[in-house]
Amino acid sequence: MDTRAFDAGVILSALPQLLEFLDITLLVGISSIVLGSLLGGDLAWAKLSQHKILNYLAQLYIYIMRCTPSIVMLFIVFYGLPALVEAVFEENIHDMDRAVFAIIAFTLLFSAYVSEIFRAAYKAVPQGQYEAAISIGISPWGAFWHIMLPQTAVLALPNFGNSVINLLKEGALAYTIGLIDMIGKGNLIIAQNFGAYGIEIYLACMIIYWLMSIGIEKAFGLLEQRLDKGQLFSSKAGKKQAVFILKEGEASGAGL
């Protein structure tokens, strides 16, 4: 048991050492967010589709992932994926970078959560607007891109931002498979000091995560304001087209 007196100076001296490994933490987090969002979008589409098999498989996947603790999924991927690949393809991936295993695990988990966010946000947008756009000759893709997607993004953004922050914090578990990220480096510093300064090191980690969470929260707040003001459209013509379609939908009674 560490009986040393608390030393605030250790926090300041540890911060630069921890920040050297922040890029690994961000690599795992950002990669998982991007890949998880893409997979989550596909899952949301599958749940919204009329195809019974796709709908059932998406529901099953989401249910399993949402019921699986993050650390359990991390271990399943880290220990199970190499065994599976070796059994099926006779390839040895045991020496693969541990960041890859972490990204795979967190991608699978993140996709399940954001798929429900995307699906709920899309269903909250009046579908009559899409039908009105189609009725006046807009292509299905154009109606989705210019009408449905911007409104869906605004509705999904707050919960999506919370999920991003949660994923960033869950990523701290990656050290359990030997990944030397920010938390992994913190544990190495503690080990090098024979278990001393644990409180100070973890407080330093907490400060970094706290600042990152505040930054992400502020960034999503600004993005939400931009989307609310209709600044997602890249041109005035695109905005005018969207407004025209919305008005047509309301006039025809197909909208709200």
Predicted regions and their residues:
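Transmembrane alpha-helices and adjacent helix-loop boundaries
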Residues: 1-256
